[in-house]
Regions:
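Exposed beta-strand and adjacent loop surfaces of beta-rich binding modules
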Residues: 20-22, 38-42, 100, 198
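Positively charged n-region of N-terminal signal peptides that target proteins for export
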Residues: 1-4
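A short, amphipathic beta-strand motif
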Residues: 21-29
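Hydrophobic h-region of N-terminal signal peptides that target proteins for export
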Residues: 9-18
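Short, hydrophobic/glycine-enriched beta-strand segments
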Residues: 24-25, 44, 220
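Non-catalytic cap/lid and distal C-terminal segments of serine-dependent acyl enzymes
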Residues: 47-49, 55-273
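Short, ordered, surface-exposed loop/turn motifs in non-cytosolic proteins
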Residues: 33-48
Length: 273
């Protein structure tokens, strides 16, 4: 497992380039604000169309193939991915089995950070998606294309990154859940740009009726949650199609989640809580 995860990380981050099967990927030079784009170009190959290839890359045996190269020139609107590009779960395009593939490419944009330490680094800034490069707003990607590939035969394929991931609509405040965003002075000084901390706050029943009251605070540090989870004010959906949780090896896990979320709401707003 550790070996697979390391290979995936290297495919997403290591700079390389190269022939056999060649993908010519065309993308914008500048973003919508007129700035030269820096980042990494990723190519995905999947043997099925159950989902877009960019969403099928993971550390499981069923993962799609992914190959990556860095953008090396600000003046170029083309990137080549060939047999020299580092990949996962195989190292090279030369190692993929011949067959039919659904292909897609994506440009993961980087920002330049002038650190307080004096160093300058290029990194992908989170844009509200929780460091999920396949869904980061502002990233360019292509439509899915089906194609026949054989690494033993020379072939050149053009891909156009003519789609852009839209901005994420922030969650709305409700009676019980509020969302706050605070600019951090220390983080902003270190990174050389405004950096913010966010929080989703679950309020107790009767909070608005007692503005003078003080309440105990419990903090849970999640992993980039987009909203407060585990809490719903509506009853579980009786028509929800049960799914299978591979992680817990459990059928109907989504139904169980909704039941517990609603139970938490009912219990936490009751007079006995």
């Amino acid at each position: 497992m550790k070996k697979h995860i390391l290979s995936l990380v290297m495919a997403l981050t290591l700079p390389l380039n190269g022939s056999g099967i060649t993908f010519n990927i065309e993308h914008p030079k500048k973003d919508e604000n007129g700035n030269f784009i820096q980042g990494r170009v990723l190519l995905f190959l999947s043997n099925n169309n159950l989902d877009e290839p960019r969403f099928q890359t993971n550390d499981k045996s069923s993962t799609a193939f992914v190959f990556g190269v860095d953008l090396k020139s600000k003046n170029s609107s083309k990137t080549i991915i060939d047999s020299k590009a580092f990949g996962y779960p195989v190292k090279s395009l030369d190692q993929i089995p011949p067959g039919e593939y659904f292909i897609q490419a994506l440009l993961h944009k980087y920002e330049t950070f002038n650190l307080k330490t004096g160093h300058t680094v290029q990194l992908p800034m989170d844009r509200g998606e929780g460091q999920r490069w396949h869904s980061a707003p502002g990233n360019y990607y292509s439509k899915v294309k089906k194609i026949s590939l054989d690494p033993k035969k020379r072939k050149s394929i053009k891909i156009f990154l003519d789609q852009i991931i839209p901005e994420i609509v922030p969650p709305s405040d409700t009676k019980y859940v509020k969302h706050i965003k605070i600019e951090s002075r220390l983080l902003s000084e270190f990174w050389g740009r405004p950096m913010h901390l966010g929080a989703h706050v679950l309020l107790p029943e009767g909070f608005d009726d007692h503005p003078e009251a003080s309440y105990p605070l419990m903090i849970f540090h999640g992993h980039f949650p987009k909203d407060f989870g585990g809490f719903r004010t509506s009853a579980p959906d009786p028509d929800l199609e049960p799914d299978y949780s591979e992680r817990f090896q459990l059928e109907g896990y989504n139904r169980i989640v909704q039941e517990h979320e609603y139970r938490f709401y009912k219990e936490s707003t009751s007079n006995e809580f």
